[in-house]
């Protein structure tokens, strides 16, 4: 037996929510630095998000560009999410090609993503795309926020965490329409409990 002191020995970790922003925004985080950092932390597989690179990964051509940008730069195993936006949600052949290229699923936002070329999706977009996702048996990963009227304090200090939390109230997560999906970035414990309930309203 070998004593490794304070070191931890474990299987390689998997991180399914990583932003490797090549091509287009390498200064944020690229394949080289992102996958080296993952390896240094014991993460042996990452799944890259379809936004923050430019262009965003919403069709076969942009996915091919992403793969080309990654050549020779990967230090761990990398898989990819494709993007679901209003521009491709109703085009079955575009989604077919993207999924058949090898993305592990599709990622969408139901609130503004903060990236201009990755627009938020709405209920008709999701309903159209879910048929294609079901056909291919791949998941939808959604920022499942449904914005409602929020009264924000114009004098709140933008540097405080409480000010940020006020922009994402619990009720945004509690109003929901559930399908087979990964729901991202829960911050309200009650919302998670609600999402796990299988009732007539889900």
Predicted regions and their residues:
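Alpha-helix-loop-beta-strand connector modules within alpha/beta enzyme cores
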Residues: 10, 59-77, 125-142
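Active-site mouth loops of central-metabolism enzymes
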Residues: 16-29, 52, 57, 76-90, ...
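Short coil/turn connectors at secondary-structure junctions
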Residues: 4-5, 9, 43-44, 73-77, ...
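Active-site loop-to-helix "anion-binding N-cap" substructures in soluble metabolic enzymes
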Residues: 49-75, 84-88, 94-97, 108-115, ...
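Metal-associated gating/positioning segment near the N- to mid-region
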Residues: 4-73
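Hydrophobic faces of well-ordered beta-strands that scaffold small-molecule active sites
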Residues: 12-18, 46-48, 78-82, 104-108, ...
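Histidine/acidic residue-rich metal-binding segments in metalloenzymes
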Residues: 90-202
């Amino acid at each position: 037996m070998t004593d490794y002191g304070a070191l931890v020995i474990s299987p390689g970790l998997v991180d399914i929510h990583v932003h490797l922003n090549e091509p287009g925004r390498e200064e944020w985080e690229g394949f080289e630095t992102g996958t080296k950092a993952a390896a240094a932390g014991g993460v042996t597989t990452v799944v890259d998000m379809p936004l923050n690179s430019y262009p965003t990964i919403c069709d076969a051509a942009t996915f091919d560009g992403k793969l080309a940008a990654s050549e020779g730069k990967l230090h761990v195993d990398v898989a990819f999410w494709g993007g679901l936006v209003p521009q491709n949600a109703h085009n079955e052949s575009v989604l077919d090609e993207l999924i058949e290229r090898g993305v592990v699923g599709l990622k969408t936002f139901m609130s503004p993503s903060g990236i201009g070329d990755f627009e938020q999706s709405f209920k008709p977009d999701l309903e159209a795309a879910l048929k294609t996702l079901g056909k291919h048996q791949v998941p939808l990963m959604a920022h499942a926020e449904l914005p409602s009227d929020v009264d924000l304090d114009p004098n709140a200090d933008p540097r405080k965490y409480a000010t940020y939390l006020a922009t994402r109230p619990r009720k945004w997560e509690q109003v929901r329409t559930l399908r087979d999906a990964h729901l991202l970035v829960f911050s309200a414990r009650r919302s998670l409990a609600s999402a796990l309930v299988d009732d007539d309203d889900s």
